[in-house]
Amino acid sequence: MAKKVANILKLQIPAGGANPSPPVGPALGQVGVNIMDFCNAFNAETQSAEKGMPLPVVITVYEDKSFTFVVKTPPAAVLIRKILGIAKGSGEPNREKVGKLTRAQLEDIAKQKEPDLNSNDIDAAVLIIAGTARSMGVEVDL
């Protein structure tokens, strides 16, 4: 018989940086999960990722207080900022541009994000990433 799901948590945690302090500790403590078990498991699974890169994680908590988690790929906005070497996107994306992305750079990001994107092929994934870039005030070269 399958375990009964009690709760689903979605958090963004830096790779290799899960610790019991906020926001991780309080979120897990509220649902009764052993915080250190999660932190150790998450840090072990993300040690190959770039240190400090924020990773979305979906934690499924069961009624017996056990848990499973799925680590997703970094957000597209974080990958775009990393490639361009900027701290944040534009405050006025329609007027003030903060950088420019080529098709090749968009394809690199799309290939990295492909498992988490809702697209059938790489061209559709590139368009999704291009939309994110435009909303950040980044010029897109398609």
Curated annotation (Swiss-Prot):
One of its GO terms (molecular function) is large ribosomal subunit rRNA binding. One of its GO terms (cellular component) is cytosolic large ribosomal subunit. One or more lysine residues are methylated. Keywords: Methylation, Ribonucleoprotein, Ribosomal protein, RNA-binding, rRNA-binding. GO terms for biological process: translation. The keyword rRNA-binding applies. It comes from the Bacteria. Part of the ribosomal stalk of the 50S ribosomal subunit. Interacts with L10 and the large rRNA to form the base of the stalk. L10 forms an elongated spine to which L12 dimers bind in a sequential fashion forming a multimeric L10(L12)X complex. PANTHER family: 60S RIBOSOMAL PROTEIN L12 (PTHR11661), LARGE RIBOSOMAL SUBUNIT PROTEIN UL11M (PTHR11661:SF1). HAMAP family: Ribosomal_uL11. Forms part of the ribosomal stalk which helps the ribosome interact with GTP-bound translation factors. Belongs to the universal ribosomal protein uL11 family. This is Large ribosomal subunit protein uL11. It comes from Gamma-proteobacterium EBAC31A08. The gene is rplK.
